[in-house]
Amino acid sequence: QATTMNVRIEEGWKQALASEWEAPYFEQLTGFVSERYRQATIYPPGNRIFAAFDACPFDKVKVVILGQDPYHGPGQANGLCFSVNPGIAMPPSLINIFKEIHDDTGSPMPADGDLSRWAAQGVLLLNATLTVEAHQAGSHQGKGWETFTDHAIEALSRNRENLVFILWGSYAKSKSSLIDHSRHLVLTSPHPSPLSAHRGFFGNHHFSLANDYLARNGKQPIVW
């Protein structure tokens, strides 16, 4: 019998999302996810499913970057969207993100794709779907994760002020309606994927725009 995963998650998030833990959809989701981890290769590692929340406590969030679902190749996904661990080759989208940061802010290209240094500064690196089957992009979409992460976005929108939400690509942009635009800055552009980066991701200046907004609202800018 499937029981709710004992969700270990940062305390501020645990409270902000209190109504999720006993919700029927979440029980169903955790039953599904637990079973898939037993039967197949699932990414990220089970102890990293909620890594984005743990790395960026609820009351420390300043910027939200929304991804779709985790990388599905061996050793890539680490629970933070777009991020890979040191020593893992940077995926093309991440290289394009660093190119835009370099062009926008002058920051040099980093040695690796580990974005935990952003998370430590208050950047929530949130995938809409938090798990995926090896080599099958999108395989855990529509199982309940999107409900959970939508509620996380809504909780931030409602309970925090002057955050920056960065939405790249049509999927992320579809989450714009969850956010109160009068309380927060919402930045949108095409996705950094090589398929779309030249259609307006490059030159979007999102990193400097985010920092300008944070500074205007008395918050420490992010060292991108």
Language-model features: where?
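Short, Lys/Arg-enriched N-terminal segments with co-localized hydrophobic residues
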Residues: 1-4
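A polyanion-binding, active-site-adjacent surface
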Residues: 7, 19-167, 171-174, 179-180, ...
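Short, contiguous pre-domain boundary segments
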Residues: 10-14
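Polytopic transmembrane helical bundles with strong interfacial aromatic enrichment
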Residues: 204-205
